Structures are given as C-alpha cells and as structure tokens.
Amino acid sequence: MDFSNTIRSKLLPALAAFALFFVVSAAYFAPQFRGEALPQHDVIQYEGMAKDISDMRAATGEDPQWTGGMFGGMPAYLINVAYPAQLVKRTVGQVVKIIDTPAGFLFFAMVSMWLMLLIVGINPWVGIVAALAYGLSTYFLLIIGAGHVTKMWALVYAPLMMSGAWMTLRGNVWCGAALTGLAASLEIGANHPQITYYFLVAMAAFWISEGILSFREGRLRDFSLRTAALVAAGILAVGSNFSPLWYTARHSKETIRGGSELAATAETSKNGLALDYATAWSYGKAETLNLLVPDFMGRESGTTFPADGQTAAVLNDYGLRGATQQLSAYWGTQPYTGGPTYLGAAAVFLAALGIALARGRNKWWIIAACVVMILLAWGRNLMGFTEFAFKYLPGYNKFRTVSMTLVVVQWAVPLLGALALMRLWKGEIPRERLLRALAWAAGITGGACLLLAVAGGSLFDFGRAESADYMTDTFRHIFESNNMRSYIHRGMDIESAEATADAMAADRAAMMRADAWRSLVMILLAAGGVALFALRRINRYVLTGLLAGVMLLDLVPVDLRFLSSENFVSPRRNQVTASAADKAIMQDKDPGYRVLNLTVSPFNDATTSYFHRSVGGYHGAKLARYQDLIDRYLSNADDGVLDMLNTRYLIVPGKEGQPEAQRRTTAFGAAWFVDSVIYAPSAQAEIDLLGKTDLRTTAVVSGQNPAKSASRPMPLGIYASARIELTEYRPNYLKYEYTLPEEAVAVFSEIFYDQGWKAYVDGEESPYFRADYVLRAMTLPAGTHTVEWRFRAPGWTAVEGVTLAASLAILLGAVAALVYCFRKRTEKEK
C-alpha cells in the first residue's frame, strides 16, 4: 500500500479522532487543568470508607483487608483491597492514567467507543460521530458529577469487550479471543459487576443472533468453535480477576445482597435484595421520552421553578415569595434523580435511520437488547416483567437501581447510527431508498418532538394531582401555624393548592415544550445533512463533519446543565475537614470507642469514618446482620445496642447549628465479661432478645451456633478483680490484656466475621463464637493472658496464584495475537 494512502486512510483519522476527543474533554473540564477539583459525592464518601485502610497501607506497607472505620467493622473487599496478581489491571489498565480524571473519563470513553467501531468495520471518520454521541451522553456527566468512579470505568471498557465478542464470532477468532480476554479482564477489574452484567446480557443477545444465523447457514461447527474461544477468553478474564471475584462472592453471602436471615426487610429478602428496594429507582414509561427530550419530566430533582414563571407568580400573590426554591420541577416517579438519560436527539434520529437501513444481521440483536433493557429499566412500572427477571434471570436480583440498564441503550444508539452512516459512506443505499428511510426516521423522531411541542400540554398532567395534594398539606400547615383555621374551613387551602398546582403544571409543560422544539431542531439539522448528502450536495467527509458538529451542539449544552465549570472548587474546599466536634473527640486517644454522627444521615454517610471509628457509614453491600441491627435498633439510637457497640460519643447539632460532641458514659468498652449466656433458637429470637436483655451482664448466643465453651452452665461468676483492656489497635489486628480469677465468657465489641478473623490466646489459636447478634465472644481461661485477633483473607496465596496464572495467559495471548494479526495484515498487503 502506498505510504501516503496509509497516512490519509489510517493515521490521519486516528490523529484527528484523538485530538478532537482530547480537545472536547479538556475544554469541558478546563478547570481541572487550572488545578481546581470537582467535589464528587461518592469520591468524598469513598475517602471516608477507605481512610483507615489507606492510613495503614501508607504507614506500614501492609494491606489490612478490613476496615474498622464504618458499620462497626467490615471486610474491605468491596472498598479497597490490593490484589498484586491482577497484572492486566496493573499494566494495560494503567494506560488510562495518562490523563487525569474527570477529563480522562470522557476522553477514554470516546476512544474506547471509536476503537470498537473500527473493529466492527466502521470507517474511522464515521466512528468519530458515534464516539462523540457515546462519550457525551448526559448520563456520563451525571455519574462523573456524583463520583461513580467504578461505574464510569466499567462503561469505558464495555465497548472494547463487546468488540472482542464481535471479532471472535465474526472475524479472526484468535485475535478476537485475545481482545475479549484483555478487554473483559479490564471490564471486570473496574469492579462494577452491575454494568458488566448488563453488557453480558447484550452480548448474550448477540450470541443468540449469531447462533440462529449459523444454524440457518449450516455453520454450527464453526460457530461452536468460536463460542468455545469466546468462553475460554471469558474464563481467563474471570481468572485474571479471580481474587476480587472470589472474595466478593464469598463475602456477598453475608451482605444484604445475599439476603437476611430474618423475615424480608425493606432492603433485603431471603435470597437477595427485596424487590421494592431494588426497584425504587425505576424509570417511568413516559419518562423514557427524556432519552429524546431532556426536560420532558422537569430535568432533575434539584431543579426549581423559574423566578419569572407562573408558579412564582401565584406564590408571590400568596405572600410566599421565594417558595419556588423549595419545589421541584421534576415530576417523574423516581424518589430522586440527578437528571435524565438524554442520548441526544440527533443520535436517536441516526439510530432510527439505522433501524431502517442497517442489515438485519447487524441490527436485530441490538434492537432486541435495547427493548429488553428499556423494559427492565421500567422496574416497578412493569412489575410482571420485572418479577419474571428477578426469578429467572440468574444474578439479576442482586442489583438495585434497575434504571441503570439504560447504559446498554446509551451504547447501542450510537452503534445503530454508525451502522446507518457506514452504509451511506460506502454508497450502498440507492437515493430513493435513502430518502424514504430518511423521511421515516425524521418523521418518527421529529414527529414525536413536534407532537410534544404542539400538543404535549394536553397529553400529560405534569404531576398536577400529586402537586395539588402536596400543596394542600403545605397551605393547611401554613394556615394552622398562623392561627388562620377559618381559611381552612372556607376551603382556601384546597383552592390555593389547586391554583399553585395548575401553575406548576404549566411551568413544567413550558420546560418540556422548549426542549421538544430544541430536539426537533437538532433532528432537522442532522436530517438536513443526510438529505444534502443523498442529493449529492455534500460529500461524505462533509457529512461526517457536519454530524460531529451537531452532536457537540446537541449534547454539550444539555450536559452543562448538570455539570459545568461552576461545579469545580479549589482543592482545599474539596477536602473533608474536621469540625470542632471531631477535633474534641480526637483528643480521646483510647483506640476502642466508636462515634455516631447524628448531624448527617448516619447510615448513608461515610465522612465520619474519615476521623473516627463510626457506628454508621455508606455502602451498598453492608453486612446483612448489621443492616438488621440498623433496621431494628440503631435507626432509633437504642441505648443498649449503642452501648454494646462501645459508642462513647454522639455528634449532634449544637445550639447554633454547628456539630457538637456529646460523651456517653454507659458504653461497655472494647470488651467485657458477662455473668451468663442466653441461647436463642433462631436469628429472629437473637435480635429480639437484644432489646430485652441486659447485654452488659448477659450474652445472647444462637443455639445453632455452638459456643465451643467448656462452661455451658451459667452463671459463670465474675469477680471484681476481672479486667480486660484493648492495648493495641489496627484495622486487621487487635491486642487485649486481661486478668481473670476463673474461666469466663468475654464479649468483644467487634463485628463477628469468621471468614478471615482468627483469635489467639498467648499465641495459640483459640475458638470463638458470635454473640449479641453481631459481636464476637470467647471463653477465656483464668489468669493473666493476652488475646490477639488477626485478619487475613482465607486462602490468599492459592487464590492469588490463580489470578496470576490467568493474568499471564491473557497478556501472553494478547502479545501472540498482536504478532499473528500483524503478520497476517502484512502478508495480505503484499
């Protein structure tokens, strides 16, 4: 091949793509390059979760694998554990570190999508258009703003994983298998199983489609071999992440994802997450239109009504100036939303064009995957289908926030658009057919926008009924608080509420109409470009350039509604800082006590763990028994349970609203001896007894969990001279000194977890058992002795060995495949 042609056809578009993606990412996150920081909720929470882990690692070089900083203590498998044998993640995975986040998120999302499109046969110039649509889809900016780091990386790697499957089943099987193994290893290593799961469902749709076609074409033998290669790549990808997967799988059985031993609670069921809890964030059926029209349902929960709108005018008339800032313009069914999953009107139009023009083999599995994912996203709004999926789709009941399935649609829409544009690029579509398809795609998408813009106000109620009920209660409260009950008797509360609800509905309708017109304009711009190409007024290079511009014009302004330079702050403001209450508590150098912070939502906030061992925390997979304790006792700040958790301090709102420390004098301490043991026949009886028992003198032990105690007859008789003290503390190591005149049971204010914790008395391993539903207990011999607790992930050496072997196989396979494919390409070009 001529060198100049190589530059023009391969190198130039690659340089253009990378340069454009970098410029777009850097421009969007320009404050990052000025040294400013983006305060991200989940990142801030993560810093609290992992604080004692990071501190110990920095101080000693040892990885504790356990945190004592939140929920009384829990394994760190789903927080921060170092797995040295994950070589793929620690080598190839470091490429993404060359550009810092958040700009790196956008850049590599677009690069990954662009590379996938090249692999499936899309021209690189066409790929730029689809990559922009994928990387700039609004959901990415929402999760970047929230700090969902693992989710974002999983979405970066997902297109590459899908392209590996495509190549394995359709192209060079060995190169495809190598790519699948490498990309799937990175995808799994991103540590967001939910995203990986949804893309595996999409991959299954592709595999089924290829299987059907192979059967029809008599290629089942070839298909079977390709399937075997794909499965082998998947096994190696899993193996290269075996360590985190193994420990996560073992640990998940003990968490709310594995179910509760009690009757189903709000968050757990017997076999997984409770259906109501898992489907709390379900996309409304009508809400799906915000994939096309961003403000269809009032934007986000935090969006208020405009100061010059009808709602403000009505409330001003009632003397409630400024009250609009307390009302949300969002009228969907989700409890809270940070914004819509807007895909771009132009991108949706191109996807519709893809449905009309793409070859059946390429499109039907994509369409099927999109339909299934949208139905799953509806969750409780399509409960029959959701219940079916929960019962029969393996592993599906382990995940919450079902609306997240739309990430597959977010990937599929640009892909469908690229498949359509590729047929135009190759000149495969006759002009008449192209114009008919263009009219159909523009008619469907543009027609929907036009209908919403012109008649949308009469098609929906814009949450008017719910608003009327809410405002009725609000006005009734106002009238009662101001001794104006006569207004209520005259029905003024209802009349005022109805007028306000009408105004709220009108403002929401205006927001929808404005964005419907906007989306229509974007569709017309994209359709106009395709029409000019069909009429041969512009060439294919101009068309792709025009469509790339439309993608930027369409998506960036909407993205900026939710995440802009205004969200950035100085690095210092982005740090977690200790309050006066925190500083006062930190003067207490005793290592054993815990803190309950009531100035935040204590069981949905990990910032307290940045400074203290916290009773609360923030995690989506906390231990199931601890969740039971929260539901039954801690949510009501039960004194007895707080005492057994050695809660020495509360942080409460002070007189001037500032956090204030309160010392509790009844906490039991880091460990204590009990006079007697009560045996409970079931987990339900165990937790019930906590509220009926003096836990300072009596331990509650499950009858199904042998106490391994030689002193079953109770009471044991504790003398005044008995003492036990925590003398050394690290997350994975605790040391106690005790003196005891006769054998007795000691309860330790540490969370029971027998998959890694071992107890030693004077250096010899000793048995222990669970007491008080979540704590540890031991029968200790008389005398003066030392008790040590050590945590180590069980089977660490063997598990890491499997991870290392699979990682090496993937890396060597990738190198071999690269050499093989390069030689094949060279021979072909000769």
Predicted regions and their residues:
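Transmembrane-helix motifs of polytopic, lipid-linked glycan transferases
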Residues: 104-121, 160, 347-349
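Transmembrane signal-anchor helices characteristic of membrane glycosylation enzymes that use polyprenol
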Residues: 13-49, 234-247, 372-375, 448-457, ...
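Membrane-interface coil-to-helix junctions
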Residues: 24-113, 132-155, 269-343, 376-392
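Active-site-proximal, structured, solvent-exposed surfaces of multi-pass membrane proteins
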Residues: 349, 375, 616, 648, ...
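Contiguous transmembrane helix-bundle modules in multi-pass membrane proteins
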Residues: 131, 147-158, 168-185, 193-234, ...
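Transmembrane-helix signature of polytopic, membrane-embedded enzymes
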Residues: 117-136, 171-177
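Extracytoplasmic
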Residues: 260-267, 549, 555-719, 725, ...
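Hydrophobic alpha-helical membrane-insertion signals
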Residues: 7-78, 255, 269-276, 286, ...
